[in-house]
């Protein structure tokens, strides 16, 4: 409600007192609820203040701000209402930041990593290193063309999907899991097979393992260095599994069997060759066969693709160990007990200890997968997921010259102080471009809330599972509204007493405004979607983008 609409209530006689109170309630209620007759639960206007503040902060920090594309957010963003206002603020800040990187080009929509052109980028200033993160975020926007055209770009003549490590096929399959658009994934199957073949030709050794330079993993100056890294091998396992599943959808049983066999073989190698039984961790192995002997955060990447056996969950004990990866502002990229932790190097981008949102995102996805297992080991819990997510949320800030703490995302940071390391080094050198890392798009956030904390586990079928990781007794309520999924718009509500959203007490799932699932408590809830369809707004947006 705008100020002028509230003023109207002040001059109404008779029932004016009621109208005044109603108007004031709507002005101050941050996540106010629409009437039950509408499909949308939350009133988007009640969240506009976040975006206005982001634009104001941008102008104060950078001397200018872009025009606020409010309609873009209204048309595309899923809306979140939670008691944790810092988490809500960063959720909306990351959509504010993400939108800046969605670019319309003659090649269609692309999503870049840096706002300024950088010399190590490819065509359209694109970089494949974080493309997997980009696609997982963009799949939750109402306009499917952002994710689909960007995905197509990587397999066009301009795309360079192997310039950096990139879990391309897994990303395509993850996009399908959200949209339900089977034909889009099937259409890309030949490209995904060719991409996989080229990786085999250039980066697979006779022993069956894949090697990579740490810089080409987007993780330069690491302690473990180059070689058979948990990253590239997990990516290739994930891609082989995804190709097999897409081939099954396409009715190509021979292709599915071929790639399933590739995945099974690589999984065995990861489990036997990259797992260090002494350190109880997945570690880089030098191509000559020598173990690196250092635990690095990338040792959790195998869980991103659900590679590990249950017995290897012991590795997660290192996550919050003071000599492991514990950090107030996010996990370290290497274990603190290593003699080479934070070894001296003048470069601004180091993966020898600083916290990197890229890797923190991978770790949170991996942890959600671990906790989603039916027989999830007790070594980790939803409390641990929220603890890591809170540290990541805490990290996404900067203090202005006048002492104000505002939302911010940049490159790497000090896990103990929250200082943005590369930013400060570049400023001290007067190295252009200024503010290179502003709104740095190398990580995810919304997807971590949607599929991790709030627990929507995307599926290839219309069977829907919501398994929240929110610890019992932590929140009295939460709502995720206007989430596109399999051609429907979902609303996921938890209302302990049923007094905030007035849809009943407990966990409720709505599809296009109609209840399809309910549990009386904050627990795993299942539902079945009706036949997929594309909502009218998504159809319109798709047509406009052509």
Role assignments for model-derived ranges:
Residues 38-61, 68, 158-166, 197-262, ...:
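The feature captures the catalytic groove of carbohydrate-active enzymes
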Residues 13-14, 21-31, 258-261, 265-267, ...:
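Beta-rich accessory regions
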């Amino acid at each position: 409600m705008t100020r002028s609409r509230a003023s109207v209530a002040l001059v109404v006689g008779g029932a004016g007192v009621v109208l005044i109170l109603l108007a004031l309630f709507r002005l101050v209620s941050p996540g106010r609820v629409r009437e039950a007759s509408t499909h949308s639960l939350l009133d988007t206007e009640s969240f506009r203040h976040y975006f206005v503040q982001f634009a104001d902060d941008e102008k104060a920090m950078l001397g200018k701000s872009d025009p606020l594309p409010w309609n873009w957010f209204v048309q595309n963003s899923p809306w979140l209402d939670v008691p944790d206002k810092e988490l809500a603020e960063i959720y909306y800040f990351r959509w504010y930041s993400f939108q800046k990187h969605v670019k319309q080009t003659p090649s269609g929509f692309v999503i870049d990593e840096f706002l300024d052109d950088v010399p190590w980028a490819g065509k359209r200033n694109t970089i494949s290193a974080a493309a997997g993160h980009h696609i997982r975020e963009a799949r939750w926007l109402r306009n499917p063309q952002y994710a689909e055209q960007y995905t197509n770009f990587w397999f066009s003549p301009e795309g360079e999907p192997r310039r950096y490590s990139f879990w391309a096929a897994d990303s395509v399959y993850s996009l399908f899991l959200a949209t339900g658009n089977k034909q889009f994934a099937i259409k890309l199957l030949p490209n995904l097979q060719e991409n996989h073949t080229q990786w085999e030709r250039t980066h697979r050794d006779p022993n069956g393992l894949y090697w990579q330079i740490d810089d080409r993993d987007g993780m330069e100056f690491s302690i473990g260095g180059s070689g058979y890294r948990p990253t590239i091998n997990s990516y290739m396992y994930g891609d082989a599994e995804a190709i097999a599943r897409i081939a099954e959808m396409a009715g190509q049983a021979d292709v599915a069997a071929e790639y399933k066999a590739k995945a099974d073989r690589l999984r065995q190698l990861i489990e036997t060759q990259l797992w260090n039984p002494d350190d109880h961790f997945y570690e880089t192995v030098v191509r000559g066969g020598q173990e690196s002997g250092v635990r690095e955060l990338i040792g959790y990447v195998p869980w991103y693709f659900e590679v590990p056996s249950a017995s290897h969950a012991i590795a997660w004990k290192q996550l919050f160990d003071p000599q492991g990866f514990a950090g107030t502002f996010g996990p370290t990229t290497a274990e603190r007990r290593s003699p080479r932790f934070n070894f001296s190097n003048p470069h601004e981008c180091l993966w020898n200890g600083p916290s990197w949102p890229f890797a923190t995102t991978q770790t949170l996805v991996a942890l959600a997968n671990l906790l989603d297992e039916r027989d999830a080991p007790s070594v980790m819990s939803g409390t641990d997921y929220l603890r890591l997510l809170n540290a990541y949320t805490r990290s996404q800030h900067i203090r202005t010259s006048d002492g104000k703490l505002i939302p911010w995302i940049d490159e790497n940071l000090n896990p103990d102080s929250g200082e943005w390391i590369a930013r400060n080094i570049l400023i001290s050198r007067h190295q252009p471009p200024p503010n290179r890392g502003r709104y740095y798009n190398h990580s995810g956030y919304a997807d971590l809330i949607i599929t991790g904390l709030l627990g929507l586990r995307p599926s290839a079928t219309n069977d829907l599972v919501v398994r929240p990781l929110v610890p019992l007794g932590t929140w009295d309520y939460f709502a995720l509204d206007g989430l596109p999924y399999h051609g429907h718009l979902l609303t996921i509500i938890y209302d302990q007493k049923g007094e905030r959203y007035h849809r009943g007490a407990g966990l409720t799932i709505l599809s296009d405004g109609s209840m399809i699932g309910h549990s009386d408590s904050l627990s795993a809830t299942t539902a079945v979607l009706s036949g997929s369809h594309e909502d009218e707004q998504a159809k319109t947006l798709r047509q406009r983008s052509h």
